[in-house]
């Protein structure tokens, strides 16, 4: 490895020129000669920073509107040259060794997102020279320091000054450089796959033959699903959407656990569906209670009182601003792991600070941005599907029984159907007045999910005559209808589609139960 005091030449070629003048000034202070391409060189010259333009060094002009400028043997030789091995050939062809390369790429992703359908404009922002410089520099990391993130510059220049720019630091920068080029190629590839499907008039762009995803670590977690499992939380690069757990800001509380994040995501995605003030309480991957009301306090109290036993140690999410009264009520009522809100009042913050262990996540404005792909890892494989969207197609619903639903029953059917989608299959949800009354989740047979919901109702001594039942999938037998009727259910919403649908409808008619077929299933495994 070359000594740090032999670092003499730096090549700068950046599309994003923010802070590049300050960077160049520090290199000059360290008596490092600068080489640069046209646009970057002009900015440096305007700021009275001495710089040699690449075209002056190579004796070959930038051509084709700047598309060809750094791809030259004197540049690539200066980067790929190994000083202990290639000195003679470099001297023969007057190749200057390049010790530092600072590069960032054309903003392909930004242009793609703004002008997705302007293919010529998007393609014109595919960087060719930049990735070539970076890959060459990273390959020759023993001789070249490569910087693709200016946040790394100050620590690098400090290491050079302190003569501590060791092999580990060089290798780490090279590793980061390859991550940068890999992600850049990935988003270009994905764009071409999408556009190729348009040319072919096919609908396969969502599921290409080869698929890659790029995530960055947001934080290490306390542990995984269990104490003996280590875990970390990774998020998508360059996210701009608010209103997700991935983009939420934790304003207080202990470090999040794997289960905290998983349950919080379910709670938040569920509560997003509602426009009126709503509260969702989640435990072990399932909503244990959900309520919608005219204000946040009433929605919380209704949700909590729906199943106070299960709410203990739960995750609570709201779709509206948390006020001081509701915050105080929560800490008076129960032990809670996480509270998720789009915004919070200053007084509510002070109240929750009395319980410093409570994790509080502020998401910003909520929006239904859960679109695209849903992934599930299996051993040596990955299952990929479209996300089960929140949209309800009322026009496809059918009233299949002799009695049609009342206005209240229809309102409760919509509410229960929205909740059922987030409950593990087999899922049964009882609700009335937009409050869940009993939830049967995760049983291997639908009848036992129904019985579980009945047990919860009976244990709490609730009178649920006139309540609504939602089932995430069809009823294979009439026993579920009879069981629901035994506690007073008056309306049922389900997908339909069983070979015994006629028998199921007759059973509902026998009990004077109104039934809606949605023609859409919501299994959740």
Curated annotation (Swiss-Prot):
Catalysed reactions, semicolon-separated: (6R)-10-formyltetrahydrofolate + 5-amino-1-(5-phospho-beta-D-ribosyl)imidazole-4-carboxamide = 5-formamido-1-(5-phospho-D-ribosyl)imidazole-4-carboxamide + (6S)-5,6,7,8-tetrahydrofolate; IMP + H2O = 5-formamido-1-(5-phospho-D-ribosyl)imidazole-4-carboxamide
Keywords: Hydrolase, Multifunctional enzyme, Purine biosynthesis, Transferase
Enzyme nomenclature, EC number: 2.1.2.3, 3.5.4.10
InterPro entries (alphabetical): AICAR_Tfase_dup_dom_sf, Cytidine_deaminase-like, MGS-like_dom, MGS-like_dom_sf, PurH-like
A GO biological-process term: 'de novo' IMP biosynthetic process
PROSITE patterns reported in the protein's UniProt record: MGS (PS51855)
Signal sequence coordinates: none
Molecular-function GO terms, alphabetical: IMP cyclohydrolase activity; phosphoribosylaminoimidazolecarboxamide formyltransferase activity
SUPFAM superfamilies noted in UniProt: Cytidine deaminase-like, Methylglyoxal synthase-like
Database matches in Pfam families: AICARFT_IMPCHas (PF01808), MGS (PF02142)
Entry superkingdom: Bacteria
Domain named MGS-like: residues: 1-148
Family statement drawn from the similarity comment of this UniProt entry: Belongs to the PurH family.
Protein name listed in UniProt: Bifunctional purine biosynthesis protein PurH
Organism: Buchnera aphidicola subsp. Acyrthosiphon pisum (strain APS)
Gene this protein is translated from: purH
